[in-house]
Amino acid sequence: MAKLRKTLGGTDWPVCKALMRQIETQSTVTLSRWAVDHAAREYLPLCGEAPALKAAVEGCRKHLTGQLSLKELKPLLREASAAARDTEGAVEQAAARATATACAVIQTPTNALGYLFYGAAAAAYSKAGTEDASRWDDLARAELEQALEELRAVSVPDEPNPAKINWNC
């Protein structure tokens, strides 16, 4: 059996470079809304019973509409991160990490790329299984390409307040 990785993808992949360039053009709010919606749709269903993750997604949505302060949101983000660490199973844990990391984009805009690496692993493992490593990279690449298309679709043209991004990779 191939060694499972927590994440799939890499910053040297052309699709990741394109994602990075697109992320750099958008505001933290746009990135957060996109990441939370994408993770809730694609990865949260793979997590099984995950009340802390569901609460974090709802908390982020409330924060983005002004119904919850960042101070009130932070405990939900911490609980989601802890729940992701404690999740069992390769698919479930990768999906949980993707969801928790997506929720934290509002605090750390570079998570808009990081959550996708966890999500790519969750998608690949759920589609190919954890035994068939030969398909993982292709499935991960397809997942990242889909995410890039979705980000481009919701991007604000000529965003006046792009997030301050410092890629440490």
Language-model features: where?
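Short, low-complexity, intrinsically disordered N-terminal peptides in bacterial proteins
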Residues: 1-2, 169
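Structured binding/interaction patches within domain cores
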Residues: 2-139
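C-terminal binding/interaction regions
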Residues: 125-169
